[in-house]
């Protein structure tokens, strides 16, 4: 199912729109059998980063994983831009998974995902996520982690994981 993905989406929207809120993403340390991830110490550290950066003056401390911002399409490939990933994104050598892509028919297919470590588009050099699918020649919509459980594989280079995201609001 996708009910947990919708819950994570609501949490992300709340974090982005409500003052004095934060979020520690746990997609990379979750559990298939419970909503309560077993890695409590790591969750506490991630929440501490947020508090230190936002409330205690440690303004240069990374405190959030990549948050979907926008995408550009070039040659039927989707180049995904993120907030909180100024230096780029990484999978730390793990295969990227959980990405999907759709065209105007709004039918999602598993996407081939890669990271270009030297991408530059008028910005400083940084790594960027690239999505494509042979089933979707004209991509319009993307999403990541749109299932109840996924093993997160996308991080910013500072080591914080990305939450589920989607580029649309039609369902």
Residue ranges of predicted features:
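Conserved, well-structured interaction surfaces
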Residues: 1-46
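Generic recognition of flexible, low-complexity loop/linker segments
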Residues: 10-12, 66-69, 87, 128-132
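A generic secondary-structure signal for well-formed alpha-helical elements
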Residues: 15-19, 51-58, 150
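A generic structural signal for short, non-catalytic loop/turn and secondary-structure boundary residues
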Residues: 16-17, 73, 94, 124
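Generic beta-strand/beta-sheet core signal
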Residues: 24-26, 83, 145
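Hydrophobic/aromatic-rich, well-ordered segments within soluble, folded domains that form packed cores
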Residues: 39-53, 139-147
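C-terminal beta-sandwich/jelly-roll accessory domains of carbohydrate-active enzymes
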Residues: 86-171
């Amino acid at each position: 199912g996708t009910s947990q993905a919708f819950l994570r989406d609501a949490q992300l929207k709340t974090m982005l729109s409500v003052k004095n809120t934060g979020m520690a993403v746990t997609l990379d340390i979750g559990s298939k059998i419970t909503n309560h991830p077993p890695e409590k110490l790591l969750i506490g550290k991630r929440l501490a980063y947020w508090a230190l950066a936002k409330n205690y003056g440690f303004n240069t401390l990374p405190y959030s994983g990549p948050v979907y911002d926008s995408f550009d399409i070039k040659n039927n490939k989707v180049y995904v831009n993120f907030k909180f990933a100024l230096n780029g994104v990484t999978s730390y050598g793990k295969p990227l998974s959980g990405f999907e892509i759709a065209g105007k028919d709004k039918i999602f297919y598993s996407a081939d995902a890669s990271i270009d470590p030297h991408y530059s588009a008028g910005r400083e050099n940084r790594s960027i996520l690239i999505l494509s699918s042979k089933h979707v020649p004209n991509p319009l919509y993307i999403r990541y982690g749109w299932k109840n459980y996924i093993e997160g594989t996308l991080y910013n280079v500072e080591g914080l994981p990305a939450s589920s995201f989607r580029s649309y609001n039609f369902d």
